């Protein structure tokens, strides 16, 4: 299927679009992560970015993609409440891989938000959703528009949570192609790749964190906990970036 034809999927009605996406997802399911990335870089629209939280295992997708497209813009959404270790990790990886890092954040500073709304993360699911919208969803939407993004690479995996278990390799959201190259990777495969390529993990991994977001809504992974329960007090898994 040619790049020209794929770009024009957005012009089709929903039924035809879904049929083509189903065919492409079947194709991608037989590819390795490296092959999916190569295919996407060649066949999907060329205004391409990847997003990264610079979390526990973020190095894997960064490494896979920059081997093939070193200058790809890497979008980071900075809430202002990341762990100090995360900010240091961002600096370290940016220097190590010469990342084309693009940082976006809310137009309202964290201090001003607290003055205006209080600690939203302490106000139940509605407060958390409002917080995520201000600090993550709105900045990401601005980034996608500012960079005229057509193709978005992300590192979501099926085994990270129930909400991600049925995600496809390729989807179209608001006219943007979204590709998930390591969707079918297991935790063991992630660990093996990190070890084989001598890659760094987030500094908090050795302190018992399996997932890292904001300081106030992230817990250590305790025995018996699901990974998704370490975020947002177990009330939800997604921050909103990958829900719509």
From Swiss-Prot:
Q: Which residues form the signal peptide?
A: none
Q: In which pathway does it act?
A: Sulfur metabolism; hydrogen sulfide biosynthesis; sulfite from sulfate: step 3/3
- Kindly state one GO CC term assigned in the UniProt record: cytoplasm
Principal cellular location given in the protein's record: cytoplasm
Q: Where is the active site?
A: 239 (nucleophile)
Which BP terms in the Gene Ontology apply to this protein?
hydrogen sulfide biosynthetic process; sulfate assimilation, phosphoadenylyl sulfate reduction by phosphoadenylyl-sulfate reductase (thioredoxin)
Q: What is its EC number?
A: 1.8.4.8
Identify the Gene3D superfamilies for this entry: HUPs
Q: Which GO terms describe its molecular function?
A: phosphoadenylyl-sulfate reductase (thioredoxin) activity
The subcellular localization recorded is: Cytoplasm
Task: State whether keyword Nucleus applies.
Answer: no
Sorted keywords for this record are: Cytoplasm, Oxidoreductase
Q: Which CDD domains match?
A: PAPS_reductase (cd23945)
The answer, when asked if Oxidoreductase is one of the entry's keywords, is yes
The record lists the catalysed reaction(s) as:
[thioredoxin]-disulfide + sulfite + adenosine 3',5'-bisphosphate + 2 H(+) = [thioredoxin]-dithiol + 3'-phosphoadenylyl sulfate
UniProt-listed InterPro entries = PAPS/APS_Rdtase, PAPS_reduct_dom, PAPS_reductase_CysH, Rossmann-like_a/b/a_fold
Functional summary from the UniProt entry:
Catalyzes the formation of sulfite from phosphoadenosine 5'-phosphosulfate (PAPS) using thioredoxin as an electron donor.
Similarity field: Belongs to the PAPS reductase family. CysH subfamily.
Q: What is this protein called?
A: Phosphoadenosine 5'-phosphosulfate reductase
Please name the source species: Buchnera aphidicola subsp. Acyrthosiphon pisum (strain 5A)
């Amino acid at each position: 299927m040619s790049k020209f034809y794929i770009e024009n999927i957005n012009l089709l009605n929903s039924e035809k679009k879904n049929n083509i996406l189903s065919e492409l997802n079947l194709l991608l399911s037989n590819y390795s992560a490296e092959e999916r990335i190569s295919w996407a870089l060649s066949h999907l629209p060329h205004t391409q970015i990847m997003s990264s939280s610079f979390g526990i295992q973020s190095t894997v997708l960064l490494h896979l993609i920059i081997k093939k497209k070193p200058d790809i813009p890497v979008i980071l959404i900075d809430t202002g409440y990341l762990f100090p270790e995360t900010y240091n990790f961002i600096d370290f990886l940016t220097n190590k891989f010469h990342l084309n890092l693009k940082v976006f954040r809310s137009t309202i500073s964290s201090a001003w938000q607290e003055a205006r709304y209080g600690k939203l993360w302490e106000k139940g699911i509605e407060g958390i959703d409002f917080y995520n919208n201000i600090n993550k969803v709105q900045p990401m939407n601005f980034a996608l528009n500012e960079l005229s993004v057509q193709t978005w690479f992300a590192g979501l995996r099926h085994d990270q949570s129930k909400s991600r278990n049925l995600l496809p390799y390729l989807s179209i959201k608001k006219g943007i192609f979204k590709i998930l190259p390591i969707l079918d990777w297991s935790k063991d495969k992630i660990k093996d790749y990190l070890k084989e390529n001598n890659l760094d993990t987030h500094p908090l991994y050795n302190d018992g964190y399996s997932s890292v977001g904001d300081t106030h809504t992230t817990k250590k992974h305790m025995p018996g906990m699901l990974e998704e329960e370490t975020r947002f007090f177990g009330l939800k898994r997604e921050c909103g970036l990958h829900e719509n």
